[in-house]
Amino acid sequence: MIHVYTSTGAWGWAGSCCWLWSFCPPACIGCIEEHLLSWPQVQGSSEQEIHYASLQRLPVSSSEGPDLRDRDKRGTKEDPRADYACIAENKPT
């Protein structure tokens, strides 16, 4: 008697899982696709991408270094060879 319940129990679980899976994927896949399609729109509208050039214009407290916010207006532009991209290109490997 236990053998009968064991064999039908395993097949019963497999059968119920297959039966449920036949109804569930269309609903789940629809939800996932909708979520994935809306992700770039939410990401792009709420946040802007931060670029290296905009990071150079961030205010710096006096204890961390010189204030470079108005350097373009004063005519004291930074040496272009000190730019991060230039340093990375000239770095010996």
Swiss-Prot record:
Main location: membrane
Pfam families: LST1 (PF05083)
InterPro entries per the UniProt record, alphabetical: Leukocyte-sp_tscrpt_1_LST1
Phosphoserine found at: S54
Localisation: Membrane; Golgi apparatus membrane; Endomembrane system
Basic and acidic residues biased stretches: 66-82
Its biological purpose: Possible role in modulating immune responses. Has an inhibitory effect on lymphocyte proliferation. Induces morphological changes including production of filopodia and microspikes when overexpressed in a variety of cell types and may be involved in dendritic cell maturation.
Membrane topology summary: Single-pass membrane protein
GO cellular component, one term: membrane
Keywords for this protein: Cell shape, Golgi apparatus, Immunity, Membrane, Phosphoprotein, Transmembrane, Transmembrane helix
Organism: Macaca mulatta
Protein's UniProt name: Leukocyte-specific transcript 1 protein
Region (Disordered): 57-82
Disulfide bond annotation, renumbered to this chain: none
Transmembrane segments: 14-32
Single Gene Ontology BP annotation: cell morphogenesis
Protein family according to the UniProt entry: Belongs to the LST1 family.
